[in-house]
Amino acid sequence: MEDYKQTLLLLISTPLYAVLIGLEMIMSSIHHKHLYTVKDTFTNVYLTSLNFGLELLIRTFCLGFLAYFFQFHFISIENPYLYWATLLILQDIAFYFEHRVDHYCRFFWAVHVTHHSSEKYNLTTGFRSSVFQPLYRFVYFIPLAIFGFKPLDIMFMYSATQIYGILIHTQYIKKLGFLEYFMATPSHHRVHHASNTIFLDKNMGMVFIIWDKIFGTFASEDDLKNEEIRFGLTKNIERPNHLVDIVFHEWVNIANDMKMNIPFTTKLKYLFMPPGWSHDGSRKTSKQLREELKGEL
């Protein structure tokens, strides 16, 4: 049954991606938007292949890990509609907190930064996967197993929501009316990928935006005044399509920071504090940058 469901997802998503990416490429060419380059697109596909390969390698371990916690579950939802709807909601909450940690802890940001490293923004940006994220993502699904959701169903739901998460990486869909109030839309996700100061570390949800509104990480595309939205990092890497640089550049930066002649506890802060933290104030976190911007207005 599991193979059937996973195969069905691939059979649906693969041609869907191909058609929509092809259409976006054509529209980009017609409108001279230059949303795509060959190198950037190839890099995105290559990175998602590495991510997918690692997921396959450790899939059995992840399922066994979650199965261990599933044996302690204390809730059973019998109604299948309620079961899948609840799993969707709880899985998206789990993703929200994983994503938030990825942005606010430099150790995990060093993994996740790969996804934000392109200055281009198109449907294939959703493929620009954080290569090593499968090594720890499943830990966030422990509560779902304890709440009575089967490990295979948890993994299936994550794969299904990933399809939606990829499709919102586009500049061609502007606003989606009332869906903007509770869904993570293309507009909301453009904010997430923006490097403009007011948008840093915002809009973490993959399917629903309500978690961002509840936990204070929401920003609207309309909040940006008198400047164009910029994609990428606050300091973009010199070789954005060089595999080693994309995957490891932040680890190199962390290593250089930890080589400084500072106390060991301070060294650890360079590993676990938010990106941009520095012991001497020479760099700033996203929160500090926003506060500084507010002071200038």
Q: What does each model-found stretch correspond to?
A:
Residues 225-297:
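Cytosolic-facing loops and C-terminal tails of multi-pass membrane proteins
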Residues 1-17:
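Hydrophobic transmembrane alpha-helical segments in integral membrane proteins
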Residues 49-61, 73, 77-229:
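Membrane-embedded catalytic scaffold of the fatty acid hydroxylase/desaturase
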Residues 16-28, 63, 88-94:
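Central hydrophobic cores of alpha-helical transmembrane segments in multi-pass inner-membrane proteins
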Residues 2-6, 34-40, 73-80, 114-115, ...:
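Helix-boundary and loop/linker segments of multi-pass membrane transporters
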Residues 22-42:
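Membrane-interface helix-loop junction between the first two transmembrane segments
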Residues 65-73:
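Hydrophobic membrane-embedded segments
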